[in-house]
Amino acid sequence: MLVLGTYGAFKTKGENMRSSKKLLVVAFVAVGTLIGAACGGSDTTSDTTAAATDGCAAPEVNLDATGTETIKIARNNWSASAVEVEIVKQLIEKNLGNPVEIVDIDENAMFAGMSSGDIDASVEVWPSGVVPDEQAFIDDCSVSNMGALGAVGKIGWFVSDYALTQFPQLSSWEGLKDPEVAKAFATAATGDNGRFLGMDPSFSQYDEAIIANLALPFQVQFSGSEAATQAEVSALSAEEKPVLLYYWSPSGAVGKYNLKNIALPAPTVDCAAEGTACDGDYPEDPIFKIASTKLAAKDGKVFNFFQKFALTTDDQLSFLGPVDIDKVDPATAASDWIAANEATWSTWFN
């Protein structure tokens, strides 16, 4: 059964990190375009076979689909996903004719729903948030790895820029060991320990483990959501009160609030496999796409579109600023991106 909800009210990005479930970074295998598909209307077998990936047999694609099947795409609880699914919806509905339904769904349920065919695709999956139970659906070939999106993400620890002026020792992560620094970040709830502002507690995170294993005098407090974190940072910035927090790049908010990444030491363990022993920085995340393997038979043209769909980090930054800073509606930001990038997206329908 799918767990659905209202956008912004659910939890995503790697559930169960707090319960020490091991994370598994997906091995990327480049996904080719459909072999000879849509190049002249041929109905030969080679024209209807998608490129194989992840050790799975290439699915047979239905290029005779009439464009009437509803395509269901997963939307996750962060700004980039909100815009990307709108780009997908607008492009598919205009160019392929299929109605598109955006589904707000927990990532754990998303993989199961995609395996069953109830969800068709997700265009933003962070490798560090894929747990073994989710990877199993890719391994059994019921969920297809559709290749890299193109953007590269980086979760990390960020600090307000004025805090670096207030505490020059924060030029190195070791400055966080200073008890006087920690007190400056403290709240009534953390006592003498500094507050580390977490976000949604279900997001992929090692922060509690990093703090414990580096013996830092900090305590994690969760805001509950990206919006709540932005509101807290905005309030603290207005008074130039220091804040240390979990965030990621690319993000419009990082630029808006002049947040600076604190480079942590390289971990001595594989944090993806030994989360509670993690003692160092987060890895870079080459974001990738997934789709239900059943989508190939449901509508091969849409399946082909998802294989070709790609956005760079710069593409994301171009619409994250308006959405995060100017509060532009994601659908409007998507429409603006489409209007400015026809030379890019038109090739996805060749």
List each language-model region with its residue ranges.
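Bacterial lipoprotein signal-peptidase II cleavage site
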Residues: 39-48
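A bilobed periplasmic-binding-protein/Venus flytrap-type ligand-binding module shared by bacterial periplasmic
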Residues: 155-165, 285-298, 321-322
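Extracytoplasmic "Venus flytrap"
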Residues: 53-86, 107-108
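Pocket-flanking alpha-helical
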Residues: 85, 103-141, 232-234, 252-257
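Short, well-ordered beta-strand elements
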Residues: 66-80, 98-103, 193-197, 306
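C-terminal motif of bacterial Sec signal peptides marking the signal peptidase cleavage site
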Residues: 34-38
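A conserved helix-loop-strand patch within extracytoplasmic ligand-binding domains
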Residues: 142-196
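Ligand-binding pocket segment of bilobal, Venus flytrap-like solute-binding proteins
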Residues: 113, 119-123, 194-271
